């Protein structure tokens, strides 16, 4: 059986990792062993933060809706409860968008929520 030298495979693997670590500071972009650890850690952060991003956007939407609802004399929880009772099915993303860009329409939604309470 022929002897297999792994130089080509190893170089390709190292090249792949160093390419992924491009732009990292110092040894993290130059030394394979350090770069590999940095790339793995970056992937872990990316995985975690893809899930966190969803939570953070929901928090942002709720904060915006709460601020706009309070300007119209209603707390966030009462506003959402009123919308549910009035059977208005608009999600928080759209509500936050309306609160920021169309204050008149949001005031109408608040009035509808108040009447349902």
From Swiss-Prot:
UniProt xrefs under Pfam families: Ribosomal_L20
Tree of life domain: Bacteria
One annotated GO biological process: ribosomal large subunit assembly
Gene Ontology molecular functions: rRNA binding; structural constituent of ribosome
Keyword DNA-binding attached: no
Gene3D superfamilies: 6.10.160.10, Ribosomal protein L20
Keywords associated with the record: Ribonucleoprotein, Ribosomal protein, RNA-binding, rRNA-binding
Spans traversing the lipid bilayer: none
GO-annotated cellular components: ribonucleoprotein complex; ribosome
The keyword tRNA-binding belongs to this UniProt entry's keyword annotation: no
Entry similarity comment: Belongs to the bacterial ribosomal protein bL20 family.
Known function: Binds directly to 23S ribosomal RNA and is necessary for the in vitro assembly process of the 50S ribosomal subunit. It is not involved in the protein synthesizing functions of that subunit.
Record-linked HAMAP family: Ribosomal_bL20 (MF_00382)
UniProt name for this protein: Large ribosomal subunit protein bL20
